[in-house]
């Protein structure tokens, strides 16, 4: 990973404005705060200009939709693009529900986010590829996941983080795989949302290189989860989350570099 981004977060304490999934709002706030960022949750469009002005990045999660949050998302995103602040989007369950597809299409029409983080099914929708999704879960498909991520990145003209047992990060021209992690991520509701929150923290200190920010966020999170699981006598989901927070609080860039299983994928244009 980049040697400096994690340290930069701890030094700069970037403010992250979040429209969060109500199911995981505390998890996202905790993970951002623990690595050194300063999370703010926003729900009223009246505060959008100031919320964006004080922030170094905006994170949008469509996990729990209703009319007011949708209006807030659109208002904040429009303001973030006006103020040239980086935006991260998490298109939760977009592959399964037509209404969510309509909303994400409207959000993406406002401008181009720096990073989109999703599972295989969600990213396949953004790529325009067929995939059998299963609600918020990734589901299954026959298409190579690297191709899914690269196609989505080119179509949306952004950095894609396709998270799963192996994370795939691509801007459509360069692609990286992160093989660290643990199966406990798949049984903990909120793992993806936390990773999205980390992407916002990393891109806040690397707005001109969202691809590297996404790699560093994914690697940090995956290594932390792996270290926790390996240290547990019996890896269990109930005790995994608090220990994950402790690990993220203590982890250093050197720790991540020591354990990272990161490979670059050769891309044929």
Curated annotation (Swiss-Prot):
Cofactor dependency: Mg(2+)
Pathway connected to this protein: Cofactor biosynthesis; thiamine diphosphate biosynthesis; 4-methyl-5-(2-phosphoethyl)-thiazole from 5-(2-hydroxyethyl)-4-methylthiazole: step 1/1
Keyword list, A-Z: ATP-binding, Kinase, Magnesium, Metal-binding, Nucleotide-binding, Thiamine biosynthesis, Transferase
EC category name: transferase
EC number(s) stated in the UniProt entry for this protein: 2.7.1.50
Reactions catalysed: 5-(2-hydroxyethyl)-4-methylthiazole + ATP = 4-methyl-5-(2-phosphooxyethyl)-thiazole + ADP + H(+)
Alphabetical list of CDD domains matching this protein: THZ_kinase
Binding site for ATP: 117, 163
GO function terms (MF aspect): ATP binding; hydroxyethylthiazole kinase activity; magnesium ion binding
List of residues binding substrate: 41, 190
InterPro entries listed in its UniProt record: Hyethyz_kinase, Ribokinase-like
GO BP field: thiamine biosynthetic process; thiamine diphosphate biosynthetic process
Family according to the record: Belongs to the Thz kinase family.
Function: Catalyzes the phosphorylation of the hydroxyl group of 4-methyl-5-beta-hydroxyethylthiazole (THZ).
HAMAP family, sorted: Thz_kinase
Protein name: Hydroxyethylthiazole kinase
Lineage: Bacteria, Bacillati, Bacillota, Bacilli, Lactobacillales
